[in-house]
């Protein structure tokens, strides 16, 4: 690595680490004594997540453990040795779970259709089961700011709902707390960090599934907006934490029904 790249890496790492720490603090993601399961896919974002948590583990005033977990779904061409070899250099506890979900998905989903939805649901269930069985207190996912914004627009445009990915949530089955420490970090930052660190990236399309065309459309739309109006993504992201229920139409969030003439002050 050249001296220039070393300086770039140092600056970028500090920047990402600061944003990660801010997100963790603002949403109380990690507590003293936690056992954090980092879900490692072999993609740039999960590598970045693991690196940031390992750095914070050294600096934080509290103690917490980190367990890296990868789910080998038996996709054809999956390089089984890549993640174990990488994780051994980190001297941390790690587990490779082997489940042939690939065959199940291929049997259920017609050829040419996107398999990501079913695949992700099966993967989530397996990882949640592992977390419960191994006394994991928090499940850490590598979703970043752009993922959160894109999910907001996917729900807005295609589901008719105002929702996204929270930085922290209790899973639907109430068995696990899920955290997203990279919530304040942009995809541009994780991509550049991955290149500078030279992570051993595992392709995400080994299954042969087509990209979700709706997500591709949303991503392209947001990138065009950002090119025309820099900081647009930051403004949208800020809006997700600046919501006024009384200015919306959801009767579950605000009691419109009981606003009456008796409330008028003159």
From Swiss-Prot:
Named in its record, the pathway it takes part in is: tRNA modification
Organism taxonomic ancestry:
Bacteria, Pseudomonadati, Pseudomonadota, Gammaproteobacteria, Thiotrichales
InterPro entries for this protein: Rossmann-like_a/b/a_fold, TilS/TtcA_N, tRNA_Cyd_32_2_STrfase, tRNA_thiolation_TtcA_Ctu1
Protein encoded by which gene: ttcA2
Q: Where does [4Fe-4S] cluster bind?
A: 116, 119, 207
Q: Where is this motif: PP-loop motif?
A: 41-46
Protein's UniProt keywords contain Iron: yes
What is the reaction catalyzed? cytidine(32) in tRNA + S-sulfanyl-L-cysteinyl-[cysteine desulfurase] + AH2 + ATP = 2-thiocytidine(32) in tRNA + L-cysteinyl-[cysteine desulfurase] + A + AMP + diphosphate + H(+)
Q: Which Pfam families match?
A: ATP_bind_3 (PF01171)
User: What's the protein called, per UniProt?
Assistant: tRNA-cytidine(32) 2-sulfurtransferase 2
Manganese recorded as keyword:
no
Query: Where primarily located?
Result: cytoplasm
The Gene Ontology biological process annotation of the record reads: tRNA thio-modification
Additional information: The thiolation reaction likely consists of two steps: a first activation step by ATP to form an adenylated intermediate of the target base of tRNA, and a second nucleophilic substitution step of the sulfur (S) atom supplied by the hydrosulfide attached to the Fe-S cluster.
| Keywords tagged on the record | 4Fe-4S, ATP-binding, Cytoplasm, Iron, Iron-sulfur, Magnesium, Metal-binding, Nucleotide-binding, RNA-binding, Transferase, tRNA processing, tRNA-binding
UniProt GO cellular component terms: cytoplasm
Q: How is the cofactor bound?
A: Binds 1 [4Fe-4S] cluster per subunit. The cluster is chelated by three Cys residues, the fourth Fe has a free coordination site that may bind a sulfur atom transferred from the persulfide of IscS.
Q: Which family does it belong to?
A: Belongs to the TtcA family.
**Native source species:** Francisella philomiragia subsp. philomiragia (strain ATCC 25017 / CCUG 19701 / FSC 153 / O#319-036)
Q: Which cofactor does it need?
A: Mg(2+); [4Fe-4S] cluster
Main role?
Catalyzes the ATP-dependent 2-thiolation of cytidine in position 32 of tRNA, to form 2-thiocytidine (s(2)C32). The sulfur atoms are provided by the cysteine/cysteine desulfurase (IscS) system.
Mention one GO molecular function.
ATP binding
Task: Write the Enzyme Commission number(s) for this entry.
Answer: 2.8.1.-
Where's it found, cell-wise? Cytoplasm
* Record's subunit section: Homodimer.
């Amino acid at each position: 690595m050249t001296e220039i790249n070393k300086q770039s890496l140092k600056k970028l790492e500090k920047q990402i680490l600061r944003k990660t720490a801010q997100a963790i603090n603002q949403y109380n993601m990690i507590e003293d004594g936690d056992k954090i399961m980092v879900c490692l896919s072999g993609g740039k974002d999960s590598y970045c997540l693991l690196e940031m948590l390992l750095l914070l583990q050294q600096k934080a005033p509290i103690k917490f453990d980190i367990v890296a977990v990868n789910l080998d779904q038996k996709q054809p061409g999956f390089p089984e040795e890549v993640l174990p070899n990488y994780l051994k250099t980190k001297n941390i506890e790690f587990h490779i779970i082997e489940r042939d979900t690939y065959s199940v998905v291929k049997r259920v989903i017609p050829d040419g259709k996107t398999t990501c939805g079913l695949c992700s649901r099966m993967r989530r269930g397996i990882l949640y089961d592992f977390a419960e069985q191994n006394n994991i207190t928090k499940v850490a996912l590598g979703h970043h700011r752009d993922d959160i914004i894109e999910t907001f627009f996917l729900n807005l445009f295609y589901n008719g709902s105002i929702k996204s990915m929270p930085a922290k949530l209790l899973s639907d089955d109430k068995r696990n707390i899920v955290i997203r420490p990279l919530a304040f970090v942009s995809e541009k930052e994780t991509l550049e960090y991955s290149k500078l660190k030279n992570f051993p990236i595992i392709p995400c399309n080994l299954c042969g599934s087509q990209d979700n065309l709706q997500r591709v459309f949303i991503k392209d739309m947001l990138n065009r907006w950002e090119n025309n109006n820099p900081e647009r993504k930051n403004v949208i992201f800020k809006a997700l934490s600046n919501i006024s229920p009384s200015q919306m139409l959801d009767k579950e969030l605000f009691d419109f029904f009981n606003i009456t003439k008796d409330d008028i002050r003159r």
